[in-house]
Regions:
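Surface-exposed interaction regions that form or flank ligand-binding interfaces
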Residues: 1-74, 81-86, 92-102, 106-198
Length: 198
């Protein structure tokens, strides 16, 4: 019995050292993702596809970029750069009823589980969040003399406030990125900003 075991071990060692450069299979560790994080990623994907649908020639979309200025760091879900300016889109896929004001640091989210239970959770106010992102990105791009606009897209259209920062429709998104406001960027400026965001 021991001899059979030794033969098997020697055969396996011989197979592994016989010039066969096959790497042993490695298994990826399981990644367990919180449902909120998964819903957020799904919402960002939906919003990105909607934004792509309104893009025109000369519009450039950047997703999930990180910028920092003076020690302040932020991640931007979607940024569009074109001759009309630079536009941030913060995306939220909050499920449930939201309560709060535009200037509140947090909002409250009420969600029913279908069994008569209601759960309350504090969530970040995306309007406050996008205002901070506007500040950081504007400072990051300060040398280009560009006005940065920022908007919130709530995938479930459940905003507790009426705000110019919150876009409600595809038409709102199209109008936001294709209307002359404070900017008219040259092609060279657009190219320079693109390089800063890559």
């Amino acid at each position: 019995m021991i001899a059979v075991l030794i033969i098997i071990v020697v055969t396996n060692i011989g197979n592994n050292s016989s010039g066969n450069n096959k790497k042993p299979h490695t298994y990826e560790p399981w990644v367990i993702e919180a449902p909120e994080k998964r819903a957020g990623r799904r919402g960002e994907h939906i919003a990105t596809e909607i934004i792509k649908g309104v893009l025109r020639e000369g519009d450039y979309l950047f997703t999930n970029i990180s910028v920092s200025y003076d020690g302040k760091r932020t991640e931007l879900d979607n940024v569009v750069v074109n001759k009309y300016g630079v536009f941030i889109f913060e995306v939220k896929n909050y499920k449930g009823q939201l309560y709060g004001n535009e200037d509140d640091y947090n909002w409250e989210k009420y969600k029913d589980d279908g069994y008569g239970n209601t759960f309350v959770k504090e969530v970040k106010n995306p309007v406050k969040q996008v205002k901070r992102q506007i500040y950081i990105l504007a400072k990051y791009l300060e040398g280009y003399n560009v006005w940065v606009e920022g908007y919130v897209i709530l995938i479930r259209s459940n905003s507790p406030v009426q705000s110019t920062y919150i876009l409600q429709s595809v038409e709102d998104i199209d109008r936001a990125i294709h209307t002359f406001k404070r900017n008219h960027l040259s092609r060279d400026t657009v190219e320079s900003i693109k390089k800063m965001l890559v």
